[in-house]
UniProtKB/Swiss-Prot annotation:
Residues 350-413 form the ExoI C-terminal domain. Its cofactor is Mg(2+). This is Exodeoxyribonuclease I. It catalyses: Exonucleolytic cleavage in the 3'- to 5'-direction to yield nucleoside 5'-phosphates.
């Protein structure tokens, strides 16, 4: 086994199996990870461990049937969620780590954030501090299929559309994947799929790895000159190769990580007519999003590329019409009120939700520095003495979080 050096850039491939599919309300059952070097060579033994659910939670039987991990098994072989989170935190916080999985941006990373939030670890720093970052092999596969599909066998689902299920891809490409929905097996399979892309399309792999961080993505965005870019996302659907050409038009006034763009594959005339009035109704805003307004979160590792990646030989396959796209851009430029109204509409659109359940409120703001000091005290306190801690928190979420933290992890104390 190669001795891992913290200064060496590396990948940490990881996966959860869970007792349900809701990333905030459902609980983890198993965590597994394998560390590789930058060339995807395994440099450490796999790590895996289990977490038993707290007494206030009922697992989803359907998930148990899929994973074959029962609550009884985790009770016997696992730990409470606090100790489970501590182990994961220590692994993820090793410097120069690119944390990567298969659909991790939408699922596994959200599980990580929520278990850290519930157990008084910072929910975010693991993905950026000490040179760390994150990436998603599923999104890389979507980009490969849309932009450079040669060399990989692409399976079809029952509807005749390309399937991006990990088990389908491994089967079609003769990759060993013995036990799907076992976290260790899924991690090995993800590494092999990543190796396949790197081998068959090395330039694509290296390009998207290089621009995975938002500071690199910013360089692709040119609002002043109305430069369109390619955006790869499941949002557009497999029938459209999970791809569109978008025109960035503005930054969200309330969140600098959100880019407002227009989907140029949509009917732009209709969208412009919709925005002749300013309306803040939630149904109207949903209609705008359905009609071509795109809110793109640069801190969620979106797959973006310059329009030049589309070669002429790709036009027919992708139903890509550059002349039509240019006409739509000119139409937007002639209707500058449209951009201003879009900015106003979304500047007033406050998406902060009041769930009245602290487990769902991770995104209702950051904790201030005083609360962070109190959080550190809680985490460093022996469970026996937690009942003696009386914190006057600034953030109203923390009182309920602290109560649940004690009840779920240290009930006997």
């Amino acid at each position: 086994m190669i001795q891992f050096q913290k200064k060496t850039p590396n990948f940490l491939f990881y996966d959860y199996e869970t007792f349900g599919i809701h990333t905030a309300l459902d609980k983890p059952a198993q965590f597994a990870c394998i560390r590789t070097d930058i060339n995807l060579n395994i440099i450490d033994d796999p790590q895996y461990f289990y977490c038993f659910p707290s007494d206030d939670y009922l697992p989803d039987p359907g998930s148990v049937l899929i994973t074959h991990i029962t609550p009884q098994y985790t009770e016997k072989n696992g730990t409470n969620e606090y100790n489970f989170s501590q182990k994961i935190y220590d692994i993820l916080m090793q410097s120069n780590t690119c944390v990567v999985g298969y659909n991790n941006i939408n699922f596994d990373d959200e599980i990580t954030r929520n278990i850290f939030y519930r157990n008084f670890f910072d929910p975010y720093e693991w993905s950026w501090k000490n040179g760390n970052s994150r990436w998603d092999i599923l999104n890389l596969l979507r980009a490969c299929y849309a932009l450079r599909p040669t060399g990989i066998n692409w399976p079809k689902n029952e509807l005749g559309l390309t399937s991006f299920k990990l088990s389908d891809l491994t089967k079609t490409n003769n990759i060993v994947h013995l036990n799907a929905h076992n976290a260790v097996s899924d991690v090995y399979a993800t590494i092999e799929i990543a190796k396949l892309v790197k081998k068959k399309q090395p330039r694509l792999f290296d390009f998207f790895f290089k621009i995975r961080k938002k500071n690199e993505l910013y360089k692709l965005i040119d609002l002043r000159n109305f430069q369109p870019i390619i955006y790869i996302s499941a949002y557009f659907g497999a029938i459209y190769h999970n791809m569109s050409c978008i025109l960035p038009i503005a930054w969200h006034e309330n969140n600098s990580n959100i880019l407002i763009a227009i989907d140029l594959f949509k009917d732009i005339k209709t969208l412009i007519n919709m925005c002749k009035k300013i309306c803040f109704d939630s149904i109207f805003i949903k209609n705008l999003l359905d009609s071509g307004v795109v809110l793109l979160h640069l801190n969620r590792c979106p797959i973006l590329a310059p329009i030049q990646v589309i070669r002429k030989e790709d036009y027919n396959r992708l139903n890509f019409h550059r002349f039509s796209l240019n006409k739509k851009i000119e139409l937007i430029k002639k209707n500058m009120f449209f951009i201003q109204n879009i900015k106003i509409i979304f500047s007033k659109n406050n998406n902060t939700n009041q769930f009245f359940n602290v487990d769902l409120e991770i995104y209702n703001g950051f904790f201030n520095s005083k609360d962070k000091k109190k959080i550190q005290i809680i985490r460093n306190t022996d469970p026996v003495f937690l009942k003696h801690i009386f914190c006057n928190f600034h953030d109203s979420r923390l009182k309920n979080l602290f109560f649940r933290y004690r009840a779920r992890n240290f009930f006997i104390h």
